[in-house]
From Swiss-Prot:
This is DNA-directed RNA polymerase subunit alpha. Residues 246-325 are annotated as: Alpha C-terminal domain (alpha-CTD). DNA-dependent RNA polymerase catalyzes the transcription of DNA into RNA using the four ribonucleoside triphosphates as substrates. It comes from Paraburkholderia phymatum (strain DSM 17167 / CIP 108236 / LMG 21445 / STM815) (Burkholderia phymatum). GO terms for cellular component: cytoplasm; DNA-directed RNA polymerase complex. Its EC number is 2.7.7.6. Residues 1-231 are annotated as: Alpha N-terminal domain (alpha-NTD). It holds the Pfam family RNA_pol_L. Keywords: DNA-directed RNA polymerase, Nucleotidyltransferase, Transcription, Transferase. Gene3D superfamilies: 5' to 3' exonuclease, C-terminal subdomain (1.10.150.20), DNA-directed RNA polymerase, insert domain (2.170.120.12), RNA polymerase, RBP11-like subunit (3.30.1360.10). The gene is rpoA.
């Protein structure tokens, strides 16, 4: 009698738009479609890392219930429009950007003056409408975070940092806009009692739907690994000197990072075959690699950061015994 559980063998991704996709996984044992679908959905909505405006300072405005001469929108609507701007930061956790515009016309997210390591995903997003003689001068603080953080948590949690005219925003950091899932019937040979999991994911463009589901799965695996390593107190006391376990992600080849062909070839030319090899190198060491420039380095750092890793890390007992080169 078979006792092992089925694992999905078919994973199909159907693009429904630039940041919208349907992911189909099958087959699952009966009941596992809802078990995993609900868990992934909750993680996708609550635990993904993203970027959001958190503080705004507008010239001539003391509080959010003000109005500005020459600006059609009041400050409340202006703030709502600013919260709709989708930012993406590279290799930093926060940045302050400036929006200055004068004269009649439409103000869009593309008018924001950006630092070199910050980009706007939706530059056509409308922020305000200026009439003749109108002027807008705004400082926007953008931060990296997770989930949803109400503005009053920071407003009252930093008494010493109060600034007149600074408006603290509720921040929705999650790059995932909508997630839904459905469980359908699947069949393998004569078995017809299996599950097919269909997930519908839409993001704001900071990450792709495929990357969102990959990250959510890693979060679940990381949380559940604590239970997989569960030991009794007696067993733990008997083996206090056990060698530290190596994170399985470090044993994966650098090809799994899905770098550009140029970056991947440069790493292999330096005998960097595994993620564990890569994270032990410093930025200066990588920049000395032939044909690997600053753009490739930033790509590598960004991909590692999405997995909670950085360059220059120290590993004990590396490489592990039996690791093929």
């Amino acid at each position: 009698m078979q006792t092992s559980l089925l694992k999905p063998k078919i994973i199909a991704v159907e693009s429904l738009g630039e940041s919208h996709a349907k992911v189909v996984m099958e087959p699952f044992e009966r009941g596992y479609g809802h078990t995993l679908g609900n868990a992934l959905r909750r993680v996708l909505l609550s635990s993904m890392v993203g970027y959001a405006p958190t503080e705004v300072t507008i010239a001539g405005v003391v509080h959010e219930y003000s109005t500005l001469d020459g600006v059609q929108e009041d400050v409340v609507n202006l703030l709502l429009n600013l919260k709709g701007v989708v930012f993406k930061l590279h290799n930093r956790d926060e940045v302050t950007v400036t929006l200055r515009k004068e004269g009649e016309g439409v103000v869009t997210a593309g008018d924001i003056e950006l630092a070199h390591d910050c980009e706007v995903i939706n530059p056509d997003h409308v922020i305000a409408h200026l009439s003749k003689g109108g002027k807008l001068d705004v400082q926007i603080k953008v931060e990296k975070g997770r989930g949803y953080v109400p503005g009053n948590v920071r407003r009252y949690g930093e008494e010493s940092a109060k600034i007149i005219g600074r408006i603290v925003l509720d921040a929705s950091f999650s790059p995932v806009r909508r997630v839904s899932y459905a469980v359908e019937s699947a069949r393998v040979e004569q078995r017809t009692d299996l599950d097919k999991l269909v997930m519908n994911i839409e993001t704001n463009g900071v990450i792709s739907p495929e990357e969102a589901i990959r990250q959510s799965a890693r979060i679940l695996v990381d949380q559940l690994s604590v239970f997989a390593a569960l030991e009794g107190t007696e067993a733990a006391a008997e083996a206090p000197s056990r060698a530290p376990q190596i994170d399985p992600i470090l044993l994966r080849p650098v090809d799994d990072l899905e770098l550009t062909v140029r970056s991947a070839n440069c790493l292999k030319a330096e005998n960097i075959y595994y993620i564990g090899d890569l994270i032990q190198r410093t930025e200066n060491e990588l920049l000395k690699t032939p044909n690997l420039g600053r753009k490739s380095l930033n790509e590598i750092k960004e991909v590692l950061a999405s997995r909670g890793l950085t360059l220059g890390m120290k590993l004990e007992n590396w490489p592990p015994a039996g690791l093929d080169k």
